[in-house]
Amino acid sequence: MVAATTLEAVDIMGLMKLLPHRYPFLMIDRIIDIDGDDSAIGIKNVTINEPHFQGHFPEQPVMPGVLIVEAMAQTAGAICIRSLGASKPSLVYFLTIDNAKFRKPVVPGDQLKIHVKKIKKRGNLLKFACEALVDGTKAAEAEISAMMVTGD
């Protein structure tokens, strides 16, 4: 018999301890199903109260794709920092976006589930495959890379 693995979660207060981002640029509300720095699912509850909807677009609000990619990067960055515990770096810098595709508009009322999976790690450089889903349908995907740095 194989023992079941219990995956972990981080709420908004935990995220604010891990990430330097704050309103209006904190793009995730919580992270669930954390498996070390290998994978996780970030949750973003999209609401009309977000400032970007004032101009993108007032009559037909759509979440900007670049903010969906930022939510992917924040999810990946948070699990990287969390996996290091007390020896966490000062920052995780977003380095590249590859193969980004936007497949479905994300609108107020949607809940984004941002799946991130580590596909490569070399030293302090990491690469993740990411998908953002709404109701099980892929809204966006990208590969992102990041660099963890210390404040030394």
From Swiss-Prot:
Alphabetical GO biological process terms: fatty acid biosynthetic process; lipid A biosynthetic process
Residues forming the catalytic site: H56
Catalytic activity from the UniProt record: a (3R)-hydroxyacyl-[ACP] = a (2E)-enoyl-[ACP] + H2O
Record carries keyword Lipid biosynthesis: yes
Entry's Gene Ontology cellular component terms: cytoplasm; membrane
GO molecular function, one term: (3R)-hydroxyacyl-[acyl-carrier-protein] dehydratase activity
InterPro entries for this protein: FabA_FabZ, FabZ, HotDog_dom_sf
Subcellular location: Cytoplasm
UniProt-recorded name of the protein: 3-hydroxyacyl-[acyl-carrier-protein] dehydratase FabZ
Organism: Mesorhizobium japonicum (strain LMG 29417 / CECT 9101 / MAFF 303099)
